[in-house]
């Protein structure tokens, strides 16, 4: 599969060929149909968040596959996967937690500090395929366009 990975802060993304992920356990493989570019993708690419008052937070690293505003089609499901079928077209909720910390255990994965957020801690949507840990992170887009649905994965589902 083709993905686009970060190289150096502010540098060009590198086109990288790799194997298409194969689902394990409850994982779901989604083929990208649309992926938004969020302002945080720009920060991760540039390697720094401007915190204001001349303060910055260094972020990002070489080899990241950015993109957390994901919309795609389910193309494979793991043997333990339930709730997703091949051919389903879904928005992917990217704020995936570790599953073990206090935030995750009370159902607040979006507040998980270690986290496994797609496009940040795990490979994201700037690729042909993305591995989603469980079908619970997939949502129907309703009647909006594919490209608009992708942008809902960040601000729309967390609002």
What is the predicted role of each segment?
Residues 3-4, 90, 130:
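Well-ordered beta-strand positions enriched in small/hydrophobic/aromatic, beta-favoring residues
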Residues 3-22, 39-76, 112-121:
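N-terminal glycine-rich cofactor-binding segment
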Residues 9, 33, 75-80, 109, ...:
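Short loop segments at secondary-structure junctions
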Residues 14, 24, 86, 125-126, ...:
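A generic structural signal for well-ordered coil/turn residues at beta-strand boundaries
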Residues 21-35, 50-102, 142-144:
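Glycine-rich beta-strand-centered segment in the early N-terminal region that forms part
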Residues 36, 46, 134:
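Short, small-residue-rich loop/turn micro-motifs
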Residues 56-68, 98-159:
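NAD(P)H dinucleotide-binding glycine-rich loop of Rossmann-like/cofactor-binding domains
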């Amino acid at each position: 599969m083709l993905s686009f990975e970060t190289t150096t802060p502010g540098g060009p993304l590198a086109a990288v060929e790799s194997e298409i992920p194969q689902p394990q356990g409850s994982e779901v493989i989604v083929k990208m149909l649309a992926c938004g570019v969020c302002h945080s993708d720009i920060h991760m690419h540039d390697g720094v968040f401007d915190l204001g008052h001349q303060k910055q937070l260094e972020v990002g690293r070489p080899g990241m596959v950015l993109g957390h505003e994901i919309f795609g089609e389910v193309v494979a499901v793991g043997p333990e996967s339930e709730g997703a079928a091949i051919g389903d077209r879904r928005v992917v909720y990217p704020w995936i937690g570790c599953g073990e910390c206090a935030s995750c255990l009370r159902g607040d994965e979006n507040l998980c500090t270690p986290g496994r957020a797609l496009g940040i801690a795990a490979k994201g949507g700037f690729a042909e395929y993305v591995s989603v840990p469980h079908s619970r992170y997939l949502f129907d887009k309703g009647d909006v366009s594919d490209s608009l649905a992708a942008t809902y994965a960040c601000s729309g589902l967390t609002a």
